[in-house]
Structure formats: structure tokens, C-alpha cells
Amino acid sequence: MKTSLFKSLYFQVLTAIAIGILLGHFYPEIGEQMKPLGDGFVKLIKMIIAPVIFCTVVTGIAGMESMKAVGRTGAVALLYFEIVSTIALIIGLIIVNVVQPGAGMNVDPATLDAKAVAVYADQAKDQGIVAFIMDVIPASVIGAFASGNILQVLLFAVLFGFALHRLGSKGQLIFNVIESFSQVIFGIINMIMRLAPIGAFGAMAFTIGKYGVGTLVQLGQLIICFYITCILFVVLVLGSIAKATGFSIFKFIRYIREELLIVLGTSSSESALPRMLDKMEKLGCRKSVVGLVIPTGYSFNLDGTSIYLTMAAVFIAQATNSQMDIVHQITLLIVLLLSSKGAAGVTGSGFIVLAATLSAVGHLPVAGLALILGIDRFMSEARALTNLVGNGVATIVVAKWVKELDHKKLDDVLNNRAPDGKTHELSS
């Protein structure tokens, strides 16, 4: 029993995070030097994200009997994303208004160091709607894979899958090659995941070493408020959706606990994307649904980021005594409904979108970003964890809506009654 515990990725990552926190706290200079370990692990993951998405989507779409099913899945997924993301934005807006973590700070925006956030503000200038849509279209196929842009790779994979499906039996050889290549890629993922404890240790040691526990205490009210909001969202909102779909949110969280710990250590939900594709398929969701919903969700279904954006924007308004009446808050909500769709599931993207939002709204000081720059790294953990759970739940819900969910397999796996790989008849 003890041997199996020590060998489990869950235990190893949890232990690595704890050691990283201790090292960063007691030896901050050494902790900061551990940054390459975390960065290296995330880069290894990003290295295989593009081929994983390509193989999963192509084989999923090409293997479907009807192309109408693909269109239906995409439409249902986008509808779900929009509804749940809007709920997340509204919840964040309500709670930050009730708790008011920034009230009484009386910060003069003129005294803030605008240089500290200049790089984010500059990046935010390119976050327009048209720019976002145009960025989905790659300049070249090779460029899409080289940059690792999820939506660009997804677009090419969908087109490739459609074209391969139309070839029929003539494309069977290509289909078999891609499916075999997919197995090789997942073999690489298994090797990379053995390094997850090292990556989590390095990332956590760097975070605590660089920013210190003092940063947490200084703006602790906002951090606590945000974490509690994310927990409530997962338990109440996603929990209710899960219950209505026929499964327990707590059993699902237990099922993806290793992925959650990896995300906790790296602060990026993208680091668990390859394993989530595999795990959601083993949970009973058809491959074509998983291949479409998970990658798309990384740009359109970021529940944790949505909560963060409304809370952070209103917090800055409260701290700087900027006017924020009901009209301004509705305007903020409308802007965020659009700008939040450009936030990929990578560390720092939420901060860039926040800068873009403050610029678009107009009456909020962009320099106010300096207030939360130091604690953004600590808040990114809750963002990433909520995003991951949200995308997992979305996949199951969409799979059920389009009748591509194996209910018995879902129930068996979550209740530990069957091996992950066992198959059952699809139920509608």
C-alpha cells in the first residue's frame, strides 16, 4: 500500500509542491533559481499540445458517420460556453460588490508605477475582436504548429478531418497512420508526466521565493475572496450542472486529481490539456466530442478567468475610488463577454485581457493593474484549477446533449467499478 502511494503521481506532485513552498519561503534566493524547472516542464507539455490536438480532432471527425454531428457538437459547445461564462462573470461581479475588498484603500492612480504594467498594456492593444478572429487563421500550417496556437491548430485539424472523411476508403491509410502517430504522442506524454513533480516543485519554489508570503498577506482579502468565489462556483454552479447531467462533481474532481495538482504547481490549465483529452475519452465521452470541446474551451470556456476579470476590475475601481455605478458595471460586463474569449489557458493571459478590458472601458485607470501585479501569480492557481474543472464538466455535458456519452462507462469509472479502458454500449 505504501509503495503504491509513493509511486502515485498524485502523491509525488503534492509532496513536490510542499517542498517547493518550504524552499521558497526559507531560502527565497535558491527558490527563485528553481524557475527553469517549472518553465522547462511547461515547455515540454506545450511541445506536444499541437500534435495531440491535431491527432485527436482528425481521427475523431474522420471516424464519425455524419458531418452534421460535428456541426451540432460545435454549436452546442459554444452555446454552453457562452451561458456558463456569463454566469461566472455575473457571480464575480456580485461577490466583489458585496465584499468590497478594495474599499478604503484610497489609492491615487498617479502614485502607481505604470512602468510595471506597461508590457501588459502594450500587449493588450492587440486584443480587439477582429484581431482575435484573424489570429485564428494561421499564416501557414507549419506556423500554427510552430507557435502552438491552439485555435489555429484546431481550425486546420477540423478542416483536415472533414477532408479526410470525404475521401472515404481512399483515406483509410492516412487515418491509420494518424491514429498510430497519436498512440506514439500519448506515449511521449506518459514519459513527460514523470517529470511533473520536478516541474511543480520548481514553479512553486520560484513563486514563493520571488513574491514571498508577505505579498499574500498585503492583499489577502482579494485573494481569499477570489478563492472562495471559485470554490463556490465549482461546488454550486458546476456541481448543479454535473448533478443535472447525472454525475457527482466531487467524484469527477477525484478522477482528475492528478491533473489538478499539475495545474496547481504550474498555474497553467494548459499543462494538463494532453492528459485531459485522454481521460475524458476514457470517461465515456466520444473522441470527436472531446477533440472539439476541450481545445475550444481553452479560449471560450475559462470560468475561473471570467470570475477573476470582473473581480479584479471592480477591485481596482474600489481601491482607486473610481466611479463604478450600475451603468459602468453593465458596460464592464458587456466588454468582458467579448474580451474574455481571447484569454488562452496559459499563465499571464488573464492579466493581459484585464489590461485590454480596462483600456476598453475607459474610466478605469490602467495603472491600477500595478495593485494586483504582485498577487496575480497567486490568483492564477485558482483561475487555472477552475478553468480545468469547467472544461471537464463542459465536455461531459456537451457529450450528453449530442448523445455521444457512454453513461454506464461514466458511472463505472467515477465509482471505480470498471477499468478506464473498458467499453460499453453508447446510450442516448
UniProtKB/Swiss-Prot annotation:
Disulfide bonds: none annotated. GO terms for biological process: DNA damage response; fumarate transport; L-aspartate transmembrane transport. The keyword Transport applies. Disruption phenotype: Cells lacking this gene are only able to grow after a 2-day lag period on D-malate as sole carbon source. The chain crosses the membrane at residues 5-27, 47-64, 77-99, 141-163, 184-206, 219-241, 326-348, 352-374. Keywords: Cell inner membrane, Cell membrane, Membrane, Symport, Transmembrane, Transmembrane helix, Transport. It is found in: Cell inner membrane. The keyword Kinase does not apply. Its main location: membrane. GO terms for cellular component: membrane; plasma membrane. Gene3D superfamilies: Sodium:dicarboxylate symporter. InterPro entries: C4_dicarb_transport, Na-dicarboxylate_symporter, Na-dicarboxylate_symporter_CS, Na:dicarbo_symporter_sf. Induction: Subject to CRP-mediated catabolite repression. Repressed in the absence of oxygen, induced in the stationary phase and approximately 2-fold by citrate and C4-dicarboxylates. It is a multi-pass membrane protein. Pfam families: SDF. One of its GO terms (molecular function) is malate:proton symporter activity. It comes from the Bacteria. NCBIfam families: PRK01663.1, PRK13027.1. Belongs to the dicarboxylate/amino acid:cation symporter (DAACS) (TC 2.A.23) family. Responsible for the aerobic transport of the dicarboxylates fumarate, L- and D-malate and to a lesser extent succinate, from the periplasm across the inner membrane. This is Aerobic C4-dicarboxylate transport protein. The lineage of its organism: Bacteria, Pseudomonadati, Pseudomonadota, Gammaproteobacteria, Enterobacterales. The gene is dctA.
